[in-house]
């Protein structure tokens, strides 16, 4: 009985768990003046391809630096440079993949 209850609880929590992007990115970014949508398009304007954009985001999140930030000087002076992510490589890749899927309009046009 306890075993069945435990399995049901695990299945229920798994089904209702937010994805990596929602859990690790959206909560903090919701408080910022620049939206995730806007940041996505800034990356896309500079890096163009999916591969280059994802690599640039992951690189920045692992080692944030003002010199490679996509944000304006005003934003960085006000908000500052974020701290390096504590996500594992797998979690980070998954979150960036979801970010790409949510905001990429190119695939939605086809």
Predicted regions and their residues:
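Short, low-complexity, Pro/Ser/Thr/Gly-rich segments in the mature regions of secreted, periplasmic
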Residues: 97-110
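Sec-dependent N-terminal signal peptides
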Residues: 4-13
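Short beta-strand and adjacent turn/loop elements
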Residues: 22-23, 87
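Stable alpha-helical elements in mature extracytoplasmic
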Residues: 21, 53-57, 91-95
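Boundary at the C-terminal end of the N-terminal hydrophobic targeting segment
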Residues: 15-19
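Axial heme c-ligation environment in periplasmic c-type cytochrome domains
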Residues: 36-45, 62-95, 107
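Gly/Gly-Pro-rich "capping" loops immediately C-terminal to redox-active cysteine motifs
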Residues: 26, 30-60
């Amino acid at each position: 009985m306890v075993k069945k209850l435990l399995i049901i609880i695990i299945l229920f929590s798994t089904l209702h768990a937010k994805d990596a992007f929602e859990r690790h990115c959206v909560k903090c970014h919701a408080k910022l003046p620049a939206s995730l949508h806007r940041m996505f398009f800034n990356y896309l304007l500079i890096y163009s391809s999916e591969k280059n954009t994802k690599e640039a985001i992951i690189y920045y999140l692992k080692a944030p630096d003002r010199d490679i930030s996509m944000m304006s000087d005003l934003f960085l002076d006000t908000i500052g440079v974020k701290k390096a992510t504590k996500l594992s490589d797998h979690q980070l890749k998954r979150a960036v993949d979801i970010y790409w899927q949510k905001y990429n309009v190119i695939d939605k046009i086809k």
